[in-house]
């Protein structure tokens, strides 16, 4: 992800989000942005009966990530996976483009 000329590792953001007590899985992809070029967009699968809000997730990330690395949006959903359990990021990229 390249946001405002800064390279951002999606894995670093995913690892930060995954430490939240309500998060089961997280995946981060680039979301097109007019001002910054791209911004991090997080897709989060929550643990059953452990709710969380977009603000909670972003505030949680703020404790360990630099401001420019914070996800600008968080979408809660079941993450698409292959038969071996790998997250299908290409499907998430398609979903982000539909939402933009």
Task: For each feature predicted by the language model, list its residue ranges.
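AMP-binding/adenylate-forming catalytic core of the ANL superfamily
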Residues: 1-69, 77-80, 85-94
